[in-house]
Amino acid sequence: MDETGRLIRDAAGFLLQRDLGGSYRLVLLRVPVDLVEKRVRVRGYHAGDNVVEADGVAPA
């Protein structure tokens, strides 16, 4: 999975609001607090319904 969108933080963790519409709940090993509310690129794999195990999060 390789997607771009806006990184959002909520009470349950992090979400990616996709540029193409919809959102994914992200499972992250590192907490990218410097990228919250910014446009990012997420790489990883689908772990279930709308859940992504993120290998990396970087500015888009």
Give the residues covered by each predicted segment.
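A mature extracytoplasmic/lumenal domain signature
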Residues: 18-20, 46, 58
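Structural detector for short beta-strands of small beta-barrel domains
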Residues: 1-10
